[in-house]
Amino acid sequence: MKLHTLNPQTPLTQSKPMAFSTGITPSRFSGLRKTSSELRFLSSVTPPPRKQLRPVSARRKEEEVGDEGNGSVILRDRGENEDRNGGERVVLTELHKEATEAYMSYAMSVLLGRALPDVRDGLKPVHRRILYAMHELGLSSKKPYKKCARVVGEVLGKFHPHGDTAVYDSLVRMAQDFSLRSPLIRGHGNFGSIDADPPAAMRYTECRLEALTESMLLADLEQNTVDFVPNFDNSQKEPSLLPARVPNLLLNGASGIAVGMATNIPPHNLGELVDALSALIHNPEATLQELLEYMPGPDFPTGGIIMGNIGILEAFRTGRGRVVIRGKTDIELLDSKTKRAAIIIQEIPYQTNKASLVEKIADLVENKILEGVSDIRDESDRSGMRIVIELKRGSDPAIVLNNLYRLTALQSSFSCNMVGILNGQPKLMGLKELLQAFLDFRCSVVERRARFKLSQAQERNHIVEGIIVGLDNLDEVINTIRKASSNALAAASLRKEFELSEKQAEAILDISLRRLTALERNKFVEEGKSLRTQISKLEELLSSKKQILQLIEEEAIEIKNKFFNPRRSMLEDTDSGDLEDIDVIPNEEMLLAISEKGYVKRMKPDTFNLQNRGTIGKSVGKLRVNDAMSDFLVCRAHDKVLYFSDKGTVYSSPAYKIPECSRTAAGTPLVQILSLSDGERITSIIPVSEFAADQYLVMLTVNGYIKKVSLNYFASIRCTGIIAIQLVPDDELKWVKCCSNNDFVAMASQNGMVILTPCANIRALGRNTRGSVAMRLKEGDKVASMDIIPDALQKELDKTLEVQQRQYRSMKGPWLLFVSESGYGKRVPVSRFRTSPLNRVGLFGYKFSSEDCLAAVFVVGFSLGEDGESDEQVVLVSQSGTVNRIKVRDISIQSRYARGVILMRLEHAGKIQSASLISAADADPEDEDATAVAA
């Protein structure tokens, strides 16, 4: 479709105004029916026909030229469609071409005249016009304030014919210390706040220029350093740029959205910026890494902590990058007795609304999305920011803080898009390119300033030389002037007689009589010497690029020394700021219960209250038919749980990913968490907090094979699992424990035989090996349990003195805690068992009845009370899922041949399936108090 436009070369005054008329009827233009979209467009952009209030003879007569068949309609003006030169005023053009050209023209107008800053002075046109208008009004940093309305009116009337709100908003932003790293305007009155409070009306607020602005942007404005262009009505001129001495674009940053393009440049520290500029001056081939040594990253006016340097490197290298900013916080202890703490927010990320942040946190707490917070209040005042978030008793401040980072704007990202206007075109630039572009501009400014000063000095020197000639020939000059009948003849006579120029002659005529003394002559002579010296220096400066760069550096350092202030944003290189699930999940203690059928569930430790020895216990939950509890252990949420199967394969999963269930729930099938094969059962679980290099896993099979593997081999496990041990036929992996070379291993068979051996005696092997024989088993006997004796208790193993039975109860730990399948148990001092090598029968540790056998053995006595007794607790689980939690100190200390005491009355609960220990530090004191009352 073609669009009719007027020929721009033909003035509109050369022809009468044209009246638009569609002239379209269905009968005359049937071809338009095929292009309904074009018809709709034409009808939408063409005004409806109106009656012309003039004589018929003066009305326009139109005729149809034709329809080109593609929907293009050509209308010509009969008789009056030609200009005086005979040229037609109707221009035929394609609609898509005209739309493209018009849109590009509009886009470039927005880019260059409104939205994007210039790389050279770092200002958008509106900011540049505001500063220049204030400079013209004489609002220097040492002059009194003037109303902002006066400044806005000056800008609107002379330079920026747009809305007053846009101009005032731009002025306000340049005065806000939380918006600009180095404010360019000093405001007096209400200029808004970090809570997004609006500023007062312009008739109430006052402003003036900052001293930094005068020194950095306006110092050389009157010395022909930049070009001046006509303003919008050609009534006066305005600067196209300001002669910046420091890269203001990097100092205060910029943000703006144009047509199809945007910019977002972070602010930086003045001192670091000048140092980086100096480094580039001394070494134009400096790499980005070398520049980063002087300017390591952005410096935001609101402070905060910049997380990681990868985004900074990418932004400085390519112009695009993502900088993660966190608010600066501190943890305060509110009550030392209850250990209640509070998170104090002292700084927030750049461009974050403080009031909205507080409101968001309150909403999260109210909706129970953010847990552990009891109160929040804003205590900010003139002295600084202080947001207090009080935590509930027992809440982990680190977890609450990580949740704040993830759920609120306390951690936000600044997306760098360093686009600026360079040579009249928008361009994406990195750090070095921005600095180099500024240096090129600054060199031009210094050269133009030097040429301006040189021209003035030469002109003045020329005048001074003429005056000195006149003073040297004073009598002749006076006679010549007295003889002349007019000023013009006097000037002409002086030029002719003394070979002076017109300006020199005029200067002599303008001298007053008081300046004809000898003293004044000496002053002119000294001035001439000074001018010649200045001219020589300026000529030398203009002939040396090195001196120009040196002067640029000196002027930048002068501004740095005068206006520098310390960095506000801290840099944290070790943390990228990316939060994972583990960062927002409390590292609380939890209980894991696994059944033989492969069901697992996670419960809180207080699910089972402490009970007395010999009680029935509490059910751990409903079990499937023919299912029984397999393992029951204590771990923490952040632990990495290693699952070892009966086939010698190991799997891995974070503890917090196991669904939390109630005590009566059946649990989650392990096949939903792990990639188990058909018929594969999990027989042992090891929670690992850290994969230390000096730690090993000791593996023991049912048939008595043992081996030791470095824990590091299991740090990375694929989802399908890896081999942990090679098994012989009819054997299965049953027990896995974590140990070091200085520890000891205690193994026991179902018949009660016990072997103690140093871990160092066990060879360290790879994963895909079988191991060696752990102990000699009699016919029908099998390994029943295994535990580790830490090196800290080694001294107790050296006790080999025979102690009588009456002394056992008063003997301190450590002890071996034996638990039989029928619910009996006892403690035997470790000192009653001597160490032996592998592949031995061992010593008697338990005397069983004919229908009973050993279920588990533990080393207890790690934590002792003031009375020398154990503070640990043991959790017993029966085959039917009943759980009993009792104190270890309530279990009797007996000889190796004793049967023990009743720990749990099983009745119809079957046999003891598994047992686990809970340390004293992990026990809940409220449970202990409840048990004491019940007893």
Swiss-Prot record:
<feature type="compositionally biased region" description="Polar residues">
    <location>
        <begin position="1"/>
        <end position="28"/>
    </location>
</feature>
<dbReference type="InterPro" id="IPR013758">
    <property type="entry name" value="Topo_IIA_A/C_ab"/>
</dbReference>
<protein>
    <recommendedName>
        <fullName>DNA gyrase subunit A, chloroplastic/mitochondrial</fullName>
        <ecNumber>5.6.2.2</ecNumber>
    </recommendedName>
</protein>
<dbReference type="GO" id="GO:0009330">
    <property type="term" value="C:DNA topoisomerase type II (double strand cut, ATP-hydrolyzing) complex"/>
</dbReference>
<feature type="compositionally biased region" description="Basic and acidic residues">
    <location>
        <begin position="75"/>
        <end position="85"/>
    </location>
</feature>
<keyword id="KW-0067">ATP-binding</keyword>
<dbReference type="GO" id="GO:0005739">
    <property type="term" value="C:mitochondrion"/>
</dbReference>
<dbReference type="InterPro" id="IPR013760">
    <property type="entry name" value="Topo_IIA-like_dom_sf"/>
</dbReference>
<dbReference type="GO" id="GO:0009507">
    <property type="term" value="C:chloroplast"/>
</dbReference>
<dbReference type="InterPro" id="IPR005743">
    <property type="entry name" value="GyrA"/>
</dbReference>
<dbReference type="GO" id="GO:0003918">
    <property type="term" value="F:DNA topoisomerase type II (double strand cut, ATP-hydrolyzing) activity"/>
</dbReference>
<feature type="active site" description="O-(5'-phospho-DNA)-tyrosine intermediate">
    <location>
        <position position="204"/>
    </location>
</feature>
<feature type="region of interest" description="Disordered">
    <location>
        <begin position="44"/>
        <end position="85"/>
    </location>
</feature>
<dbReference type="Pfam" id="PF00521">
    <property type="entry name" value="DNA_topoisoIV"/>
</dbReference>
<feature type="domain" description="Topo IIA-type catalytic">
    <location>
        <begin position="116"/>
        <end position="584"/>
    </location>
</feature>
<comment type="function">
    <text>A type II topoisomerase that seems to play a critical role in chloroplast nucleoid partitioning by regulating DNA topology. DNA gyrase negatively supercoils closed circular double-stranded DNA in an ATP-dependent manner.</text>
</comment>
<keyword id="KW-0413">Isomerase</keyword>
<keyword id="KW-0150">Chloroplast</keyword>
<dbReference type="InterPro" id="IPR002205">
    <property type="entry name" value="Topo_IIA_dom_A"/>
</dbReference>
<keyword id="KW-0934">Plastid</keyword>
<dbReference type="GO" id="GO:0005524">
    <property type="term" value="F:ATP binding"/>
</dbReference>
<dbReference type="InterPro" id="IPR006691">
    <property type="entry name" value="GyrA/parC_rep"/>
</dbReference>
<keyword id="KW-0238">DNA-binding</keyword>
<dbReference type="GO" id="GO:0005694">
    <property type="term" value="C:chromosome"/>
</dbReference>
<feature type="short sequence motif" description="GyrA-box">
    <location>
        <begin position="611"/>
        <end position="617"/>
    </location>
</feature>
<comment type="subunit">
    <text>Made up of two chains. The A chain is responsible for DNA breakage and rejoining; the B chain catalyzes ATP hydrolysis.</text>
</comment>
<keyword id="KW-0799">Topoisomerase</keyword>
<dbReference type="GO" id="GO:0006265">
    <property type="term" value="P:DNA topological change"/>
</dbReference>
<dbReference type="Pfam" id="PF03989">
    <property type="entry name" value="DNA_gyraseA_C"/>
</dbReference>
<keyword id="KW-0496">Mitochondrion</keyword>
<comment type="similarity">
    <text>Belongs to the type II topoisomerase GyrA/ParC subunit family.</text>
</comment>
<dbReference type="InterPro" id="IPR035516">
    <property type="entry name" value="Gyrase/topoIV_suA_C"/>
</dbReference>
<keyword id="KW-0547">Nucleotide-binding</keyword>
<dbReference type="InterPro" id="IPR013757">
    <property type="entry name" value="Topo_IIA_A_a_sf"/>
</dbReference>
<dbReference type="InterPro" id="IPR050220">
    <property type="entry name" value="Type_II_DNA_Topoisomerases"/>
</dbReference>
<keyword id="KW-0809">Transit peptide</keyword>
<feature type="region of interest" description="Disordered">
    <location>
        <begin position="1"/>
        <end position="29"/>
    </location>
</feature>
<dbReference type="GO" id="GO:0003677">
    <property type="term" value="F:DNA binding"/>
</dbReference>
